[in-house]
Amino acid sequence: MRFLLGLQYFASKKGVGSTKNGRDSESKRLGAKKSDGQFTNAGSIIYRQRGTKIHPGLNVGRGGDDTLFALIAGTVKYEKFGKNRTRVSVIPN
C-alpha cells in the first residue's frame, strides 16, 4: 500500500528580482576652466560645453564639441552682448 504525502517545499532563500535602476553615466566635467581675468596659454581650454552657451570672441576658437579654447596667450575676458548672450575673448598682454 502506497501513501501519497502532500509535501510542500518552502523557499529557504527569498526570490530576488532584478531592478532596472542602479546605473548612471559618468559626469562630463563641463563648465568654465578659466575664469574672467585669468591668464591662459595658446591652446588652453577656456570653457567646455554642449551647444553654444558661451560664444567665441576675439582670439578664441571653437572645437567640434563646442569647447572654447585660446588661440593666443593672454587674459580671459567674459562679456555680455545682445539681449542675453555671453562671449569670451582673450586679450593679449
Curated annotation (Swiss-Prot):
Protein name, per record: Large ribosomal subunit protein bL27
GO terms of molecular function: structural constituent of ribosome
InterPro entries: Ribosomal_bL27 (IPR001684), Ribosomal_bL27_CS (IPR018261)
Residues cleaved off as propeptide: 1-10
Organism, as annotated: Mycoplasma mycoides subsp. mycoides SC (strain CCUG 32753 / NCTC 10114 / PG1)
Protein's gene: rpmA
Pfam families: Ribosomal_L27 (PF01016)
NCBIfam families: L27 (TIGR00062)
Family: Belongs to the bacterial ribosomal protein bL27 family.
Keyword annotations of the record: Ribonucleoprotein, Ribosomal protein
Superkingdom of the source species: Bacteria
Cellular compartments per GO CC: cytosolic large ribosomal subunit
UniProt feature, compositional bias: Basic and acidic residues: 21-36
Chain spans, region Disordered: 14-36
Post-translational modification: The N-terminus is cleaved by ribosomal processing cysteine protease Prp.
Ribonucleoprotein is among the record's keywords: yes
